[in-house]
Regions:
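A short beta-strand-turn-helix
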Residues: 59-81, 105
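Short, internal strand/loop/helix patches
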Residues: 133-182
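Short, Lys/Arg-enriched N-terminal segments with co-localized hydrophobic residues
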Residues: 1-9
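N-proximal helix/coil linker or "cap" segments that precede and/or mark the start of modular domains
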Residues: 30-59, 76, 139-146
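Short pre-active-site segment immediately N-terminal to redox-active cysteine/selenocysteine motifs
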Residues: 79-81, 86-89, 120, 173
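Thiol-/selenol-based redox modules, centered on thioredoxin-like
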Residues: 176, 181-210
């Protein structure tokens, strides 16, 4: 009876450990950094779910994975942009990338997909949001290139410079996807989690109204 009791206790312990590990895995793509506050204690952080249509992301300057300069002017190239914020450590982000790559090839000429690698700051970056909040480092640039190659992604991916991180400070978990107009303004609430069909419908609905 004693032996049976010990085995039962061990099984319960294993179940508990497994449950805890599953919770950790499910939360792995979350940024655990606290919401930003100003010096007077007033909350100045806007959660991504509070962003409404018409919200501008502001200006930024950064590089793509190949070192080419990228600014917010990239949005003006098309009527609508699917902007996918992801991280190299995020399984769900990587899983949806083949679908995003396929969607990018299917979109009409006046629409595009752009990625933001939130944990890959430009080379030489020692600190800042991408490093401090997302555990990023420049080594992730090569990892991001590898992931893009393996998933068939050919669209532009932007590195997380400090101004890019500021533009996307509302993002607390990835993937988070914004649908933007030519001016870099949101045309609908952001998508939290992978939803390629949802992105596609949002683009189609917007273009149909132009």
């Amino acid at each position: 009876m004693y032996k049976y009791g010990r085995e039962t206790d061990m099984k319960k312990l294993l179940i508990l450990i497994t449950t805890i590990l599953m919770c950790i895995v499910l939360a792995a793509c979350a940024n655990e950094a606290p919401a930003g506050e100003d010096t007077e204690g007033e909350d100045t952080h806007y959660a991504v779910e509070d962003i409404e249509a018409g919200t501008g992301l502001g200006s930024f300057t950064s590089e793509d994975l190949d070192g080419n300069e990228v600014t917010e002017a990239i949005f003006a190239d098309k009527d609508v942009t699917i902007l996918n914020v992801w991280a190299t450590f995020c399984g769900p982000c990587i899983e949806e990338m083949p679908e995003l790559a396929a969607l990018a090839e299917e979109l009409p000429d006046n629409a595009q997909v752009i990625g933001v690698v939130i944990d890959a700051p430009p080379a030489g970056t020692q600190d800042g949001t991408a490093v401090d909040l997302w555990g990023g480092n420049a080594d992730n640039i090569d990892l991001a290139k590898e992931i893009c190659g393996e998933t068939g992604v050919k669209y532009t991916n932007i590195l997380a410079s400090e101004s890019v991180s500021k533009a996307f400070e509302s993002v607390e978990a990835v993937p988070t996807t914004f649908i933007l107009d030519r001016s870099g303004n949101t045309i609908c609430k952001p998508f939290l989690g992978a939803d390629v069909d949802g992105y596609k419908k949002a683009v189609e609905d917007y273009l149909a109204g132009l």
